[in-house]
Amino acid sequence: MIGREQQGKNVIVRATLLLFIIMGFFSMMAYLHTYNTPAQLLHLPIVINTWTFINATRVAYRTMQSGGVTERIALDGIEKGCNWCEAHPDHCDFTVGYGGSPNEWGQTTLDAMVMWGPTREVGAVGYMKRVKPAISVARKVMERTYHTILVGDEATTFAVEMGFEEEDLNTTRTAEMWREWKAAGRKPNFWKGPHNSTQGVTKRKEMNEKPEFGRWNHDTIGMVAIDQQGNVACGVSSNGATWKIPGRVGDAPIVGSGAYCENEVGGAAETGDGDVMMRFSPSNRVVQMMKGGMHPKEACERMVAEILRYYPNCSGAIIAVNKQGQIGAAYMNLPNGFPFCLQNSNMKDAAIITIKD
Ligand SMILES: *[C@@H]1O[C@H](CO)[C@@H](O)[C@H](O)[C@H]1NC(C)=O
Ligand SMILES: *[C@@H]1O[C@H](CO)[C@@H](O)[C@H](O)[C@H]1NC(C)=O
Ligand SMILES: *[C@@H]1O[C@H](CO)[C@@H](O)[C@H](O)[C@H]1NC(C)=O
Ligand SMILES: *[C@@H]1O[C@H](CO)[C@@H](O)[C@H](O)[C@H]1NC(C)=O
């Protein structure tokens, strides 16, 4: 005989089981919703990129909308979009492409990366000289070699072998900047103490205690795109930090830092003080957080909060988009907030979105 108490317990057990089944059903639905949302809900294609470089957004969007150049449509969007900044550095704060961010020797060098979400293929160039469309060379590294990153003069050699033109990246603008910087005692710089270099001796009293990172010194175009087929690509192009020590490679060509994307989840890209930010693999981390179901905005905010715990003065920003077409961004130590660009098929034109505290 089953006592009243026992029956009561059975009811509770059954109710609990039922509850678990219902909860399981809903969490499975939520899971399926996260990973299999139909394309028509997403307003694809979609592209986001850092800063106000809205023509790059438009070019990326139009490239995808018109069906791309190759079958990797989102990647074509990334390449053509970033190419726009590389060809028009004056419209991209001189932080991408030629004619900007000279190093201690007055040279402009380029960093770039692309990633294809369906296969996780990556190609990148670092500290590349004398070739303008760096992101296109990065794509060649990905598609024509088994390597991931080529750097320096040999990246240039590779680019020339691939048919790219060799050109000066310095201009009268960078030459003038460099002269002024030398005349002002080579401040700021990235050394931690007095040092001798080929440029001469720098004494303690001539040093900037902290290098100045900010809007104009240190940024990048970082871009994430999802094409009509739901494929995700991401990429970055940058001319690095102004007055960098020759040889310095920034975060832009470092996969997981400059950008990262997974077809099942979405993608993220970053901009800012790359020397510090690359220590956290922020773009990869944001994508992994989104994979766990986190909204892109919250993922970016958590990542920025973590960096600030270790480097309270680090300046920069992260943008992200998930497979549902939800976007998010977060920034740190940018006094005027952080602008980024968005275009999707629900919008007549690209828009600049500025986040501020
Ligand atoms: C975008 O490109 C057009 C020319 O195609 C140019 O007139 C305009 O100034 C550019 N806008 C920005 C914000 O760079
Ligand atoms: C760029 O720098 C190189 C090496 O210093 C120099 O030969 C060249 O004339 C410069 N080009 C421009 C446009 O200033
Ligand atoms: C730099 O070189 C000078 C001699 O030219 C030497 O006295 C000094 O110790 C050197 N400083 C450093 C930091 O190496
Ligand atoms: C951050 O900047 C403040 C103000 O310039 C300075 O006092 C502080 O030492 C800096 N902190 C670090 C960790 O660099």
Located regions from the model:
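Alpha/propeptide regions of enzymes that mature by internal proteolysis
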Residues: 12-357
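Short, low-complexity, Lys/Arg-enriched N-terminal segments of secretory-pathway carbohydrate enzymes
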Residues: 1-10
